[in-house]
């Protein structure tokens, strides 16, 4: 049966038939797999539509003379990071790939939108009777783990798509490429599990930075290979096996429980993305997203070091007002670092600064003889584009927020992902509590008999 026979009684529309009012959203469709499919497909269509429309909006407003991070872009930097339309140094030279990406997403959203409307209005209320493969029962533990397995395989394929792009299809932008960044093929991805999985065991503080501390594209692509393999193998495992008895006892098996698990995973992803957007300058290259806070502070110290060195200052021995080195000093571990208040960020790693290091920190000989013009230009640009706001000359502290002229994409992305992740985590707790209460057999939510909406005039 490809359609709903009774057009005047589409499932999930009334509180009498579902037990939920209209504002309860998809809760009305808990037992209507066909209509829930329509809601999910339509939701995917909305997401893809926003992506396509916003990509075209950013492309139409793009100014070649300005860096992306000065133009409030949040989608084009992602496409540039993938190596589309980029020249050495992160210069955007071709916007056609961005236009094509936007159009492809718009067309895809139309297909998804049609599918969502079809399954919401025309398609069968439930899939179990007509399409048993797509049908399900929330209590069917084996079916639920099969669906989990399918999702894991799709996630693995997504990870492999990035790997294929970096290894075979045009390469990927590497901010660490010599001379200030370039597109290159990742020919030797890191496959050593000791290296890849050691990131999970690193301290989240300082230069270690947990998984956010990754600072080379070989590890990034190697990590995606491991993620892809793990997800595909895990997906096949969950499709072919039944849940063990301990898993059957440990988990709550209901639609709301699965929702809570999903929200918990999304919250973790959102918080991790926020950390990446704020701290990492490898997968979020500063050429596209603007400098990190630490990078802007170091850039300021570096810029004034270059200026004063040209004016004859002895950068090796000059002391600042506190008696510490004005230009260079020692870190807590004995490395030579930039002086002044940048000591807060002494363990920063950035492509424009690393060529001046040796085994014991910054190399005085390199600083005196090897500083390149592109390093000076980049530091001068980053100095005035901190994600915190504009910097003054005191030493890297934001004293006056310059939000009228510049707000860093790092600020937008970090703040949005942090708060979305936080509130999604609250949703995880809420639905987990309701699911556990239902499984335990006691009352949850408000009393349906006295629900305010029952005394209100119907919307139609």
Swiss-Prot record:
Subcellular localization, per the record?
Plastid, Chloroplast thylakoid membrane
Prosegment residue ranges: 1
| Entries under InterPro entries matching the protein | PS_antenna-like, PS_II_antenna-like_sf, PSII_PsbC, PSII_PsbC_sf
- Which Pfam families does the record match to this protein? PSII
Q: How does it assemble?
A: PSII is composed of 1 copy each of membrane proteins PsbA, PsbB, PsbC, PsbD, PsbE, PsbF, PsbH, PsbI, PsbJ, PsbK, PsbL, PsbM, PsbT, PsbY, PsbZ, Psb30/Ycf12, at least 3 peripheral proteins of the oxygen-evolving complex and a large number of cofactors. It forms dimeric complexes.
Protein task? One of the components of the core complex of photosystem II (PSII). It binds chlorophyll and helps catalyze the primary light-induced photochemical processes of PSII. PSII is a light-driven water:plastoquinone oxidoreductase, using light energy to abstract electrons from H(2)O, generating O(2) and a proton gradient subsequently used for ATP formation.
| Protein name as it appears in the record | Photosystem II CP43 reaction center protein
Organism listed in the record: Cyanidium caldarium (Red alga)
């Amino acid at each position: 049966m490809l359609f709903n026979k009774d057009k005047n009684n589409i499932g999930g529309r009334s509180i009498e038939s579902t037990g939920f009012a209209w504002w309860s959203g998809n809760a009305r469709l808990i037992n209507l797999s066909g209509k829930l499919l329509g809601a999910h497909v339509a939701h995917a269509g909305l997401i893809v539509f926003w992506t396509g429309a916003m990509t075209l909006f950013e492309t139409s407003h793009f100014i070649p003379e300005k860096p992306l991070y000065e133009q409030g872009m949040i989608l084009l930097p992602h496409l540039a990071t993938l190596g589309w339309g980029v020249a050495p140094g992160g210069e955007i030279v071709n916007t056609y790939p961005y236009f094509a990406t936007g159009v492809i997403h718009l067309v895809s959203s139309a297909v998804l939108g049609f599918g969502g409307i079809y399954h919401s209005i025309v398609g069968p209320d439930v899939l179990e009777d007509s399409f048993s493969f797509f049908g399900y029962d929330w209590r069917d533990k084996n079916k639920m783990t099969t669906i989990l397995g399918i999702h894991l395989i799709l996630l693995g394929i997504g990870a492999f798509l990035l790997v294929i792009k970096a290894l075979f299809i045009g390469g990927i932008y590497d901010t660490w490429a010599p001379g200030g960044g370039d597109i290159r093929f990742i020919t030797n991805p890191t496959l050593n599990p000791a290296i890849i999985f050691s990131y999970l065991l690193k301290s989240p503080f300082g230069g270690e930075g947990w998984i956010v501390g990754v600072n080379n594209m070989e590890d990034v692509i190697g990590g995606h290979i491991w993620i892809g393999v793990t997800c595909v193998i895990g997906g096949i495992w969950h499709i072919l096996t039944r849940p063990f008895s301990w898993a059957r006892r440990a988990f709550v098996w209901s639609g709301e429980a699965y929702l809570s698990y999903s929200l918990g995973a999304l919250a973790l992803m959102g918080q991790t993305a926020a950390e990446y957007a704020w701290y990492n300058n490898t997968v979020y290259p500063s050429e596209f997203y603007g400098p990190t806070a630490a990078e802007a502070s170091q850039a300021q110290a570096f810029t004034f070091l270059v200026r004063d060195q040209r004016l004859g200052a002895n950068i090796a021995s000059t002391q600042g007002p506190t008696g510490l080195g004005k230009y260079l000093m020692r870190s807590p571990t004995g490395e030579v670092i930039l002086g002044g208040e940048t000591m807060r960020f002494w363990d920063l790693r950035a492509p424009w600064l690393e060529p001046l290091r040796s085994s014991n920190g910054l190399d005085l000989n390199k600083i005196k003889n090897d500083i390149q013009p592109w390093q000076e230009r980049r530091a001068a640009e980053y100095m005035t584009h901190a994600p915190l706001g504009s910097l003054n000359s005191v030493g890297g502290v934001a004293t006056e927020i310059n939000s009228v002229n510049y707000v860093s994409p790092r600020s937008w992305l970090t703040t949005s992902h942090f708060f979305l992740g936080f509130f999604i985590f609250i949703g995880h707790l809420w639905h987990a509590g309701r699911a556990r209460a239902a499984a335990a057999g006691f009352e949850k939510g408000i009393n349906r008999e006295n629900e305010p909406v029952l005394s209100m005039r119907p919307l139609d």
